[in-house]
Every structure is written in structure tokens, then in C-alpha cells.
């Protein structure tokens, strides 16, 4: 009887410890959300990650917590022009890859696979944990059987952001010369080929793009426009974050239905559920106190797994360029954005500061002006 009592006591204590751990994690997540990613985040993150998982790469260049400089002047200036002598730091790139692998594996996390889900399965949305979705037959049919990046490795990769800083850059030819080209949010390329190139190996598509760029497919004209854009991908990977928020459910299903109905030649991928938090965790441990990683930062983090050298274009979260000329938020539309707004889910200038630091150390190359040979 005494042995049985001790067993019950041990089980109760174990449950209590587990409860306290999860309560602590929830409190930290709430604190991060309420503070906008500043102040006490570093100590909070250190309590969640063991010493062996802490990154050693110097990204912010100091031991003090990273805070957004609201003037942005200290962040955006002194980027070397494309013609400056930038040298790839292979040792640092490999170290970053190994550290990121402690948090995620892009080969696996780039997409949920068909063998892990079946039609009717219930999934909790990442940002709306109280809301759920059922895996539809269309979604199931489009899940890849194996990772689209299984055993893939590329010499050079271009990640093309959508900033208006690309306009008049003449970077199109340079971008297309890379082994693997990643683009964001179905950004148009044909009309801007001189500056952004045409080659696409992977393109992301946030569900909100369907609303913003294709008028929620309200009629046949808009459906045809989206269909033409999808057909132009011609075998590329279409990366659709389907499990983020419930607001995107219908839009994801519309796209899935179009792809199946019209036999569009794309390789669909739907990122794993842990991916976003894993990416965020990596950057937080490097004192880059982001709220929610942007698509560009997500793509860079994933690309470290399968790219030897990474080149970034169109990453510029400021309304003026280095010469104080106006810069559009997107190179292809007139959308406005408050880069430093507390209401924004992203901290773009802070992300840029981290990428700029990695550029200076040779881990990646950041191009924010004209490319070599541009006329």
C-alpha cells in the first residue's frame, strides 16, 4: 500500500511539473506578444532553450538586446553597393546551417507529406488555436508524397523580396543566373523582368494574396488571371501556408480546386505546423526579437539548408532609399505599409538589421541598389 501511495505521489508531482512548464511557456509567449518583442524576451527565450541550443553567430554585434531604431538611420545606411568586394564566408554559412538544424529541418518542414494526414483530419490553426479546419480531399490530393527538396543542394540561391527598391536595379539577369530562385507571394515578373528576372523555382502564396491581387476571384476574369499566373510557374514549387489562420481557409481551397481542375503544372507544398515557431525560436535565441517572421526571413532560414551561397534582392523595409529617393512598398503595386507600426505583425527594420549584419560577415549577400552590369 505504501509503495502504491508513493507511485501516486510521484505521478502527481510529474503532472504538476509539466503543468508549470507549459504555464511558463504560455506566460512567455504572452509577454512577447504584449511587448512587441523587446525588453525581457532574451531571458524568456533562454529559459526555454538549453545552453546547447543557443546560437553562437554574432548577428546584432553586441550582447545587448536588439531594439528597433525607430529612425531607421543606423540600420539602413552603409550597405555596400553591388560592385563592392563581398566575399562569401563558407565557415560561417555552415555554422548557421548547423545551428538552424537544431530548430528545424527545411527538407522536412517545407511541407506536410501525404502519409501524415488523411481527408477529414482536424488541424488547429497556428494563429487561431481555438479554430480548426478539416483536411479536404483537394488538399490531401495535392500534398506531396516526398519533400520537394529531398536531397537537393544548390550552389547559389536568390531570394527575391518585393520591395520597390528593385525598380531600375537591372538585377533580372543576375537573379536568373542563380541555381535556384525563390520568390514571394506570387509577385508578377513578366512586366518587370529587367529588374526582377523571370526564373522561378519556388514561390510562396499567402492566402491574403488572393484577396489583394486577385479580388477574391469574384468573377471569371479574376479566376483566369490567377490561372494564367499559376500556369506560368511551369513546374515550380508553390508554397502555400494553409494552416496559419482560419481567414485563409476558403482562399486556399479555391486555389487547390483551380490547380486540380485545370491540371496546373506546379508542385504544391504546405509548410509544417511547427515551422513558424521554430524559425522564430532560432532568431530569438540570436537576439533578433521579431514578432512574426516575414516571408522573406522564413525563406532565408529555410534556404540555409540547401543553398551554399544565398543572395537577397528586394529586401528594403524603408520608404526612402540610401539617396533619399522614395521607395514603393511593393515594386508592382501602390500598397502602403507602416514599417515601424506597433500594429504590424512583423518587425521588418529589425529583420533587415540582422540580415545586414550577416551580409557584412559574408554569410549572405544583400543587394539593395543596382546590380553589376545594369544600365
Swiss-Prot record:
CDD domains: GT29_ST8SIA2. It is an enzyme of class 2 (transferase). This is Alpha-2,8-sialyltransferase 8B. Glycans are attached at residues 60, 72, 89, 134, 219, 234. Disulfide bonds join 157-307, 171-371. GO terms for molecular function: alpha-N-acetylneuraminate alpha-2,8-sialyltransferase activity; nucleotide binding. The chain crosses the membrane at residues 7-23. Autopolysialylated. Autopolysialylation is not a prerequisite for the polysialylation acitity, but enhances the polysialylation acitity. GO terms for biological process: N-glycan processing; oligosaccharide metabolic process; protein glycosylation; sialylation. Its EC number is 2.4.3.-. It catalyses: [N-acetyl-alpha-D-neuraminosyl-(2->8)](n) + CMP-N-acetyl-beta-neuraminate = [N-acetyl-alpha-D-neuraminosyl-(2->8)](n+1) + CMP + H(+). It comes from Pan troglodytes. Keywords: Cell membrane, Disulfide bond, Glycoprotein, Glycosyltransferase, Golgi apparatus, Membrane, Nucleotide-binding, Secreted, Signal-anchor, Transferase, Transmembrane, Transmembrane helix. GO terms for cellular component: extracellular region; Golgi apparatus; Golgi membrane; plasma membrane. Residues 1-6 are cytoplasmic. Catalyzes the transfer of a sialic acid from a CMP-linked sialic acid donor onto a terminal alpha-2,3-, alpha-2,6-, or alpha-2,8-linked sialic acid of an N-linked glycan acceptor through alpha-2,8-linkages. Therefore, participates in polysialic acid synthesis on various sialylated N-acetyllactosaminyl oligosaccharides (alpha-2,3-, alpha-2,6-, or alpha-2,8-linked sialic acid), including NCAM1, NCAM1 N-glycans, FETUB N-glycans, and to a lesser extent sialylparagloboside (SPG) and AHSG, which does not require the initial addition of an alpha 2,8-sialic acid.
Amino acid at each position: 500500500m505504501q509503495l502504491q501511495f508513493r507511485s501516486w505521489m510521484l505521478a502527481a508531482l510529474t503532472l504538476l511539473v509539466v503543468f508549470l512548464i507549459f504555464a511558463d511557456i504560455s506566460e512567455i509567449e504572452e509577454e512577447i506578444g504584449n511587448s512587441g518583442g523587446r525588453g525581457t524576451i532574451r531571458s524568456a527565450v533562454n529559459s526555454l532553450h538549453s545552453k546547447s541550443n543557443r546560437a553562437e553567430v554574432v548577428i546584432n554585434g553586441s550582447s545587448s538586446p536588439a531594439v528597433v531604431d525607430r529612425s531607421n538611420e543606423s540600420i539602413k545606411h552603409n550597405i555596400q553597393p553591388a560592385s563592392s568586394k563581398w566575399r562569401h564566408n563558407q565557415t560561417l554559412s555552415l555554422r548557421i546551417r548547423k545551428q538552424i538544424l537544431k530548430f528545424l529541418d527545411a527538407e522536412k518542414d517545407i511541407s506536410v507529406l501525404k502519409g501524415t494526414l488523411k481527408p477529414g483530419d482536424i488541424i488547429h490553426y497556428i494563429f487561431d488555436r481555438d479554430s480548426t479546419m478539416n483536411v479536404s480531399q483537394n488538399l490531401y490530393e495535392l500534398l506531396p508524397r516526398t519533400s520537394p527538396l529531398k536531397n537537393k543542394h544548390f550552389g547559389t540561391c536568390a531570394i527575391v523580396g518585393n520591395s520597390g527598391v528593385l525598380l531600375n536595379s537591372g538585377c533580372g539577369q543576375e537573379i536568373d543566373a542563380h541555381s535556384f530562385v525563390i520568390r514571394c507571394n506570387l509577385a508578377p515578373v513578366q512586366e518587370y523582368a529587367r529588374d526582377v528576372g523571370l526564373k522561378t523555382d519556388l514561390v510562396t502564396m499567402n492566402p491574403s494574396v488572393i484577396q489583394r491581387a486577385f479580388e477574391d476571384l469574384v468573377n471569371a476574369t479574376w479566376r483566369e488571371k490567377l490561372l494564367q499566373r499559376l500556369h506560368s510557374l511551369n513546374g515550380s514549387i508553390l508554397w502555400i501556408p494553409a494552416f496559419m489562420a482560419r481567414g485563409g481557409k476558403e482562399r486556399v481551397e479555391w486555389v487547390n480546386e483551380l490547380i486540380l481542375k485545370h491540371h496546373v503544372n506546379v508542385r504544391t507544398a504546405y509548410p509544417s505546423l511547427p515551422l513558424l515557431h521554430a524559425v522564430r525560436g532560432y532568431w530569438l535565441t540570436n537576439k533578433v526579437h521579431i514578432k512574426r517572421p516575414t516571408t522573406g526571413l522564413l525563406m532565408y532560414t529555410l534556404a540555409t539548408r540547401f543553398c551554399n551561397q544565398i543572395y537577397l534582392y528586394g529586401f528594403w523595409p524603408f520608404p526612402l532609399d540610401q539617396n533619399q529617393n522614395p521607395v514603393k512598398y511593393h515594386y508592382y503595386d501602390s500598397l502602403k505599409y507602416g514599417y515601424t507600426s506597433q500594429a504590424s505583425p512583423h518587425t521588418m527594420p529589425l529583420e533587415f538589421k540582422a540580415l545586414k549584419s550577416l551580409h557584412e560577415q559574408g554569410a549572405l549577400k544583400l543587394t539593395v541598389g543596382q546590380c553589376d552590369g545594369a544600365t
